[in-house]
C-alpha cells in the first residue's frame, strides 16, 4: 500500500519538477518605438505644405509615438488655413499636437520682401525652434526632428534609419537641382561656408555613409537621450558667439561648444528640397522653385502626393498661348506617358497626346505604301549604319504633327517628346521668350527649347533685343521645339519621306547648318528660320549609361531589314550622351540673360 501511494505521488509531482516557472511565460514583447517630436515652423508655405504634410503622413512610424509642434506667422498666403485644416484632421492620430499661429502682422519690420531675412526674422524663428525643443524635453521625448516647410521626405523609413545611426545630431542628405544640399563640409574661422574637396563626392554619393561635418540644416534629428543634447540650443546664441546672426550658424556653434559632432547621411535618397532664392525673389518664384523639386522627384520616383487630409482645388491648365501643345508618346511606354501627363498637370499645362508611330511594328509593305525612300548615302555618323526602324517611327511621329499643324492652320505649336525633364521656371520662361519674339516681330519658323548642340567650337549668334535666344547651329535631338505654321509647311514641302534621314538630322539640313554637304544637296530649298533658347528649357531625363536609360531609336533594327539589329554598345554612342563641354570661345556670352535664367543657373 505504501509503495502504491509513493508511485502515485511520483506521478503527481513528476510534471511539476520537469517545468521551471519561466518556461511557461510568454516571450518578452518588443520595445515601443521611441517618442519623437516633429517641429514645423512655417511662413508663406501654402505652395509646398500639401506635399510636405503628405510626406509626413506617409512616414513609416507609429503616429501614437509622435508629437507634432507647429508654428506659423507673418503670412501673406493661406499657410495658416492649410495647417489648421491638417491639424484638425490628424490630431487624433498623434500623441500630442501643439499649434501656435499668429495672424498679424504679415511682414517683419524693415524687410524688403518675403524672401528677405532680417535679424528680427532670424531671432523670431530661432525662438520658435527653441520653444519646440523645450517642449520636446518637457514631454520626455526621445528624439526631436526639425523639418523645414519645403523639405520633401520621400523615404518613408527616414526616421528609423536616422535613429539607427546613433548620433546626437544627424541629418538626411537632401537632393536639389544643383550642387546645393543641407550640409557643409567646411567652415571658415568666421563661421561662413568654405568650399572643400570633400563636398562633391558626398553630394554625388560617390562616397556613401554617415559623415562628420561642421554644419547640417533644414531637416535634422536630435537624440535627446544623449547627455550632451541638454547643452544644445537654437536660442539664445552661446555667450561666446561672435559670428554672423544666422540661425543655422548659431546652432552649429552651439553644437561645437557642446562638443557634439554633426553628421550627414547619404546612404540612400531621403528627400528633396529647392535651392534657396535671393532676397529679391517673390513668392511666385519660390512656388515655382518648389514645383521644380516636385518634378525632379518624378524623374525617377513616383510623384509626391499631397496630404489626403487637405481639401485642394484642382489645377487649371492652359496651352501657354500656343494653338496646341503636342506630346509624343509610344503606346507601350505608359510609364513615360503617365509621368509626362502628371508633370504637365503640375505646371498647369494642357496637352494633346500624339500616339507615336512604333517603328518596331512597321512592316515592309507599310513602309512601301508611304513611299519612304532612304536618303542616298546616309549612314549614322557614329555607327556607320543606315536608318533604324525606331528612327523611322520617330520621324513619322513628328511628320504627322507637321501635317496636323497645316491641316488645322495652327499658327504656333509646341512639340515635346516624353523623355524630358523641365528646367526651373519653365512655363514662365517660355512664355516670356515667346512674348519677346512676338513684340520684336522676329521672323521665325522653329525654336528649339531642348537639344544637343553639336557645334562646340564657336559661339552661336545671339538674337538682338531678345533675352535667351540664339540662331541655332548644328544640333541633335528633338526633345522639344516651337514650330510655326510656315515652318511646318516648309518641312512638308521638302518631301522628306522620299529622302529619309533621322528627324534631328533633317532639321539642321533644312536650316542649312548640317556639316555634310552631300545630305543638304538633296534639299535645294533650305530656308527654315531656326533658333534656340539659350539656356535651354528642357533636358533628357536620362543619358547613355544612366540607370533606366532606354532608346527606342538606337535599340531597334535597320529600317528595311528586320534581321539586322542595331543594339550596338551604346556606351560608344555620342549621340545620346550628355552635352559635350563647350570651349570658352564657343560660349554664348553675348546672349541677353533674364533674371529668371540667372536664378535658374545658380549653384549655391
From Swiss-Prot:
It is found in: Endoplasmic reticulum lumen. Glycans are attached at residues 78, 166, 363, 561. Residues 570-604 are annotated as: Disordered. Residues 584-597 have a biased composition (Polar residues). One of its GO terms (biological process) is positive regulation of collagen fibril organization. Pfam families: Glyco_tranf_2_4 (PF13704), Glyco_transf_25 (PF01755). Gene3D superfamilies: Spore Coat Polysaccharide Biosynthesis Protein SpsA, Chain A. Beta-galactosyltransferase that transfers beta-galactose to hydroxylysine residues of type I collagen. By acting on collagen glycosylation, facilitates the formation of collagen triple helix. Belongs to the glycosyltransferase 25 family. This is Procollagen galactosyltransferase 1. It comes from Danio rerio (Zebrafish). The gene is colgalt1.
Amino acid at each position: 500500500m505504501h509503495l502504491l501511494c509513493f508511485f502515485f505521488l511520483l506521478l503527481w509531482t513528476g510534471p511539476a519538477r520537469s517545468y521551471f516557472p519561466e518556461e511557461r511565460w510568454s516571450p518578452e514583447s518588443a520595445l515601443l518605438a521611441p517618442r519623437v517630436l516633429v517641429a514645423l515652423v512655417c511662413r508663406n508655405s501654402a505652395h509646398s505644405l500639401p506635399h510636405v504634410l503628405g510626406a509626413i503622413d506617409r512616414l513609416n512610424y507609429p503616429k501614437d509615438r509622435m508629437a507634432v509642434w507647429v508654428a506659423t506667422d507673418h503670412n501673406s498666403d493661406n499657410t495658416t488655413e492649410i495647417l489648421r485644416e491638417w491639424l484638425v484632421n490628424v490630431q487624433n492620430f498623434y500623441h500630442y499636437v501643439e499649434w501656435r499661429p499668429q495672424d498679424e502682422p504679415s511682414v517683419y519690420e524693415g524687410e524688403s520682401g518675403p524672401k528677405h531675412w532680417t535679424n528680427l526674422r532670424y531671432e523670431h524663428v530661432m525662438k520658435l525652434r527653441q520653444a519646440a525643443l523645450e517642449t520636446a524635453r518637457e514631454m520626455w521625448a526621445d528624439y526631436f526632428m526639425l523639418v523645414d516647410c519645403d523639405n520633401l521626405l520621400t523615404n518613408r523609413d527616414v526616421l528609423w534609419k536616422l535613429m539607427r545611426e546613433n548620433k546626437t545630431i544627424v541629418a538626411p542628405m537632401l537632393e536639389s537641382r544643383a550642387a546645393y544640399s543641407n550640409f557643409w563640409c567646411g567652415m571658415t574661422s568666421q563661421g561662413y561656408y568654405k568650399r572643400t574637396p570633400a563636398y562633391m563626392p558626398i553630394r554625388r554619393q560617390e562616397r556613401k555613409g554617415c559623415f562628420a561635418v561642421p554644419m547640417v540644416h533644414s531637416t535634422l534629428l536630435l537624440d535627446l537621450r544623449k547627455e550632451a543634447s541638454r547643452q544644445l540650443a537654437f536660442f539664445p546664441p552661446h555667450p561666446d558667439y561672435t559670428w554672423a546672426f544666422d540661425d543655422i550658424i548659431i546652432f552649429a556653434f552651439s553644437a561645437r561648444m557642446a562638443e557634439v559632432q554633426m553628421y550627414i547621411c547619404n546612404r540612400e535618397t531621403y528627400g528633396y528640397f529647392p535651392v534657396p532664392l535671393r532676397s529679391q525673389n517673390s513668392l511666385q518664384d519660390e512656388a515655382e522653385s518648389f514645383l521644380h523639386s516636385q518634378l525632379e522627384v518624378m524623374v525617377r520616383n513616383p510623384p509626391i502626393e499631397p496630404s489626403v487630409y487637405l481639401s485642394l482645388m484642382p489645377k487649371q491648365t492652359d496651352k501657354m498661348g500656343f494653338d496646341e501643345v503636342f506630346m509624343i508618346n509610344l503606346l507601350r511606354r505608359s510609364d513615360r506617358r503617365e509621368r509626362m501627363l502628371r508633370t504637365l498637370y503640375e505646371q498647369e499645362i494642357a496637352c494633346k497626346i500624339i500616339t507615336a508611330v512604333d517603328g518596331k511594328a512597321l512592316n515592309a509593305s507599310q513602309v512601301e505604301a508611304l513611299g519612304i525612300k532612304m536618303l542616298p548615302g546616309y549612314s549614322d555618323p557614329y555607327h556607320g549604319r543606315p536608318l533604324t526602324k525606331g528612327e523611322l517611327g520617330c520621324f513619322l511621329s513628328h511628320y504627322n504633327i507637321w501635317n496636323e499643324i497645316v491641316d488645322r492652320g495652327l499658327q504656333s505649336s509646341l512639340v515635346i517628346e516624353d523623355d524630358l525633364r523641365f528646367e526651373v521656371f519653365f512655363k514662365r520662361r517660355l512664355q516670356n521668350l515667346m512674348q519677346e519674339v512676338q513684340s520684336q516681330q522676329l521672323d521665325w519658323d522653329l525654336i528649339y527649347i531642348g537639344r544637343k548642340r553639336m557645334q562646340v567650337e564657336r559661339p552661336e549668334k545671339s538674337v538682338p533685343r531678345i533675352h535667351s535666344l540664339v540662331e541655332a547651329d548644328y544640333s541633335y535631338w528633338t526633345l522639344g521645339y516651337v514650330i510655326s505654321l510656315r515652318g511646318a509647311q516648309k518641312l512638308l514641302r521638302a518631301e522628306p519621306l522620299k529622302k529619309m534621314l533621322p528627324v534631328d538630322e533633317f532639321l539642321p539640313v533644312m536650316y542649312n547648318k548640317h556639316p555634310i554637304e552631300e545630305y543638304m544637296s538633296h534639299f535645294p530649298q533650305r530656308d527654315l528660320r531656326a533658333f534656340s533658347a539659350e539656356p535651354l528649357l528642357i533636358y533628357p531625363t536620362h543619358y547613355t549609361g544612366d540607370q533606366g536609360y532606354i532608346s527606342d531609336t538606337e535599340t531597334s533594327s535597320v529600317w528595311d531589314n528586320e534581321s539586322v539589329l542595331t543594339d550596338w554598345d551604346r556606351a560608344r554612342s555620342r549621340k545620346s550622351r550628355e552635352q559635350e563641354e563647350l570651349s570658352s570661345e564657343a560660349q554664348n556670352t553675348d546672349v541677353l540673360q533674364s533674371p529668371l535664367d540667372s536664378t535658374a543657373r545658380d549653384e549655391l
